[in-house]
């Protein structure tokens, strides 16, 4: 391993990178023990709905409760969250996903699904509640790029998009407060423009004289499944949620009738892939 530079302009550049890490680490250590125990009790005492009950309508209040707990208790481990994916959250998720995209391997379009939306979502909700939900393979197609090259595109089936959107909403409210301030990708209220603005401000404040531009090649395709699940368990120790994520990770890819599987990578085109990649990268940086 190369030695870390210790002098001159390079040292100033390293200080800039570590500034966000050190600041956020100190923030994570200010949690009140009393508040942590209260929140832990609330989370552990949450229970799934009983069989035979009608679809639960929460109006998003479940996510608000989870977010408040996560805000005030950055080390809290949530043990029961998968049941928050109820009928109402599924319906909200359907409204938020892009409707213009192509159909997946089941050939069901958003327009067709919406013709009997409540019944379709109720059936989906029942399969989730009974543990009968099965993730479908992602359909892979290739599109042209400049220069004559082609790029693979993954198209999940509509129901997988809906459930992934709901699960991603839960994971985001739990993990987002832990992410570093210098992390901008796929986060609500953040953008490339904000990243550039923050970088400029840090450069002016700390007299930064150099910047490294780097890209992680094939990030989504090379995330180790077991490591990812271990990282998620640090905040979400819910077997139901972990199994649900595992179904998407192991669903495989369908290309021209051939089904293939991989032990690495998040779902191609998956709505949940961005938050999974953020969790993974945050854990790598944190150590």
What name fits each language-model region?
Residues 1-107, 111-118:
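Non-catalytic, polymerase-adjacent accessory regions of viral genome-replication enzymes
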Residues 82, 112, 155, 159, ...:
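Conserved aromatic-histidine-acidic binding/catalytic patches
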Residues 93-97, 166, 244-249:
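Short alpha-helical scaffolding segments that buttress acidic/His motifs in well-ordered protein cores
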Residues 112-135:
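Amphipathic alpha-helical blocks
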Residues 127-142, 146-147, 178-190, 194-287:
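Conserved polymerase palm-domain catalytic core
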Residues 145-156, 160-165:
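Glycine-rich active-site/cofactor-binding loop and its immediate structural neighborhood
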Residues 158-168, 210, 229:
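Duplex nucleic acid-engaging cores and interfaces of nucleic-acid transaction enzymes
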Residues 164-165, 169-184:
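Electropositive, glycine- and tryptophan-enriched low-complexity nucleic-acid-binding patches
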């Amino acid at each position: 391993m190369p030695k870390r530079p210790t002098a001159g302009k390079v040292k100033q550049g390293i200080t800039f990178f570590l500034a966000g890490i050190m600041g956020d680490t100190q923030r994570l250590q200010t949690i009140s023990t009393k508040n942590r125990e209260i929140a832990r009790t609330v989370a552990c005492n949450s229970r799934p709905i009983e069989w035979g009950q009608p679809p639960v309508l929460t109006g998003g209040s479940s996510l608000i409760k989870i977010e408040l707990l996560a805000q005030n208790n950055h080390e809290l481990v949530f043990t029961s969250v998968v049941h928050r994916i109820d009928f109402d959250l599924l319906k909200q998720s359907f409204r938020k996903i892009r409707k213009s995209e192509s159909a997946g391997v089941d050939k069901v379009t958003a327009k067709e699904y919406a013709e009997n939306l409540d019944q379709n979502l109720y059936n989906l909700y029942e399969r989730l509640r009974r543990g009968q939900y099965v993730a479908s393979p992602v359909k892979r197609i290739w599109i042209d790029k400049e220069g004559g090259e082609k790029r693979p595109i993954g198209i999940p089936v509509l129901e997988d998009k809906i459930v992934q959107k709901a699960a991603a909403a839960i994971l985001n409210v739990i993990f987002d407060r832990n992410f570093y301030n210098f992390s901008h990708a796929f986060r609500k209220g953040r953008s490339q423009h904000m990243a550039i603005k923050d970088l400029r401000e840090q450069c002016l404040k700390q007299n930064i004289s150099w910047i490294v531009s780097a890209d992680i090649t094939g990030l989504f395709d090379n995330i180790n499944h077991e490591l990812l699940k271990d990282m998620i368990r640090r905040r979400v120790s819910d077997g139901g949620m972990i199994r649900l994520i595992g179904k998407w990770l192991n669903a495989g890819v369908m290309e021209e009738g051939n089904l293939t599987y991989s032990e690495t990578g998040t779902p191609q085109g998956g709505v949940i892939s961005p938050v999974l990649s953020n969790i993974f990268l945050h854990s790598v940086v944190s150590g």
